[in-house]
Regions:
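A cross-kingdom feature that marks ATP-driven nucleic-acid transaction machinery
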Residues: 1-15, 42, 55, 69, ...
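Conserved lysine of the Walker
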Residues: 45-46
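Accessory nucleic acid-recognition modules appended to NTPase machines
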Residues: 202-342
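Structural recognition of the conserved hydrophobic beta-strand(s) that form the central parallel beta-sheet
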Residues: 95, 120-126, 146
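Interdomain motor-coupling "hinge/lid" segment immediately C-terminal to the ATP-binding subdomain
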Residues: 2-3, 8-10, 126, 132-239, ...
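Hydrophobic anchor at the beta1->P-loop junction of P-loop NTPases
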Residues: 37
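Pre-Walker A adenine-sensing motif
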Residues: 11-30
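Short glycine-rich substrate-engagement loop in P-loop NTPases that contacts/grips substrate
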Residues: 61-93
Length: 393
């Protein structure tokens, strides 16, 4: 079976279509022995593993092997036994896709870690998985990372043929005028921004199929597999979760009316809050809290995780202001603490930076607020173009 899997590995690596080199590739310490890569369905986790193999090993180098736990072979053979065979044959790096498809996966990874000291394992899993929190056997030995959908920077590099680097939030704040000029010297970001908001986050927009239909299928899989299977929720509750997602999508980006949602979905308030948390873990929604608050308290705002999801859920009815705020929140997600703002600002970031998302000239300015504007391509002092925040990763 090892030979068959090597042939599959060679074919997949040879034919992988990875037109954009993901920023995460350079952020991972590949010398770590156990690396977990989480990400929502559709963001390119499989492609990422194959891209790593192609960059670091020759096609016929048997030191690296990609396997997918969806293979029926692993229904009759343990991961530990297989890893042992690979290790004895001279294997050094085992790339495991969809590791959660095998029961007791975390114990198996721990056993591999203990038994094969020279073997490095890189595995992918659903964004719903809480790798170390729910699997204490991985504490202290596993480094976890998040693979996200395309940033606007990655989308620009692909569509405009540029080679833009990511910038930090501080760089954008302090040097936004210069950065904007440098970017516009090689491409026109305004030409591509609307397309990115509509379909640029998920790499499968490159496939010659209907993007919206594909995204709806992916969203259903997120709920049916990532939420129900991993959270062990009975199938009979599937319709309730889908209805909740729809109700949240059409109600805008404000605070959820938990009592009304509980009545609409026919479940308890506590269950509604748990379902919203699961949808957030699946990267379908984002929960935005006030400063000092967190789950299980009710969030101050519930937003779609990215703007592509907004177009899929409410085609033709996307509120522009909600969309702009969703883009900004998504651009900072995972790397910065984004909280609900007050009357003068939309968001409070990292506890002290105040941002107001706008589509027009501010009538009055507060000196401690950064005005993020969607209606400009170049900024001035504390007014910064919205698209620049798409260069954060």
């Amino acid at each position: 079976m090892l030979e068959s899997l090597f042939r599959t590995h060679q074919y997949l690596v040879e034919h992988v279509d990875a037109p954009v080199r993901r920023a995460l590739m350079d952020e991972i310490n590949w010398r770590d022995r156990l690396i977990g890569i989480k990400g929502s369905r559709g963001v390119g986790k499989t492609t990422f593993l194959l891209q790593y193999a192609r960059e670091n090993f020759s096609l016929r180098d048997r030191k690296c092997l990609y396997i997918n736990m969806n293979s029926f072979y692993f229904q009759g053979h343990s991961l530990v036994d297989f890893a042992g065979q690979f290790y004895k044959s001279g294997g050094q790096v085992l790339l495991i896709d969809q590791v959660f498809k095998q029961s007791n996966w975390s114990q198996s990874l721990r056993e591999c870690y203990d038994k094969f000291p020279m073997l490095r394992i890189v595995f992918t899993g659903s964004s719903v998985m809480r790798l170390k929190e729910e699997n204490p056997e991985l504490n202290g030995i596993c480094r976890s990372y998040n693979l996200r959908g395309f940033s606007f920077r990655e989308y620009l590099n692909l569509m405009a043929g540029t080679n833009l680097r990511p910038y930090t939030l501080r760089e954008i704040e302090n040097r936004h005028e210069r950065i904007a000029r440098e970017v516009m010297a090689v491409c026109d970001p305004a030409k591509h921004f609307a397309s990115y908001l509509h379909h640029g986050y998920y790499p499968f927009f490159l496939e010659k199929t209907n993007f919206s239909e594909n995204l709806l299928k992916v969203m259903n899989m997120m709920i049916e597999v990532d939420v129900l299977l991993i959270k062990q929720i009975e199938l009979k509750y599937l319709d309730r979760i889908k209805k909740l997602l729809y109700q949240l999508a059409i109600s805008g980006t404000g605070a959820p009316n938990v009592s009304q949602l509980a009545g609409d979905v026919q479940t308890s308030r506590a269950t509604i809050m748990n379902y919203i948390k699961y949808l957030s873990d699946a990267r379908l929604m984002n929960m935005v809290y006030r400063k000092g608050e967190e789950f299980p308290k009710k969030p101050a705002r519930v937003m779609m995780h990215n703007t592509n999801l907004m177009y899929a859920m409410t085609p033709g009815k996307v509120n522009r202001q909600d969309m702009l705020e969703t883009f900004f929140q998504n651009a900072l997600w995972g790397r910065h603490d984004v909280k609900m703002g007050d009357r003068s600002c939309t968001f409070l970031v990292d506890g002290n930076q105040r941002f107001r998302i706008m589509d027009e000239v501010p009538r009055r300015k507060a000196t401690d607020v950064i005005y993020v504007r969607a209606d400009i391509t170049e900024g001035n002092e504390q007014e910064i173009p919205l698209w620049l925040y798409g260069l954060l990763y």
